[in-house]
Amino acid sequence: MKTKAGNYLVSSRHLALLTLIDGTDGHPIWILGSKRNEFKDLSDGRATDFSWQHHARFYQNESHITMFDNHGEHTGTCRETCLSRGLHLEIDEQEMTVRVVKEYFHPDRVDAGAMGGFQSLPSGNVMTAWGHTPAFVEFTYDGTPVMDVQRGKIGGGTQNDMFAYRVHKSDWKGRPTWAPSLALEAPDKNTNNAKLWVSWNGATDIAKWAVVC
């Protein structure tokens, strides 16, 4: 991800770290996570204990980072120590500190060995995609699931063909390119007692029709 200053946030999932790379000469400005971590963890180690992560992004004026922390290579139900999570961090580049703002765990306590995504929504909710665990979950900001969708068998791993690599939620307005369809029932062969049905399949913002004769 490119920053406003022209630098780059680079996620190295096999090294379990994030690096901010200078966009001019390519040197690392700082490293977050793994053995070369340069930040003081204010959350008892939970802020820097991520691995195999995906979809790392700056958030809120680049003082926050969100990501999907796979936290291991196992896929399926898991123990507390290896649960995948949606992770929201706050960083202070002056004090070189990092803390956990929020963690989002799957309601069924699962792990995703690969893939995954994290999207911060305008409402404050969070959409998480669970990669090799074929599911996606929307949470409120405080961590309450409000939508939990499972697209396949949990624990199928790489044999599962219903991965959820990324899931994005957005407002969508359907406006078909074709004209509405009309059906008229006129038992008296005139407008008396006649009924008119209108359908515009795909339109999302039609509340009522005004028929002008």
Where do the language-model regions lie?
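Histidine-/acidic-rich catalytic cores in large beta-rich domains
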Residues: M1-C213
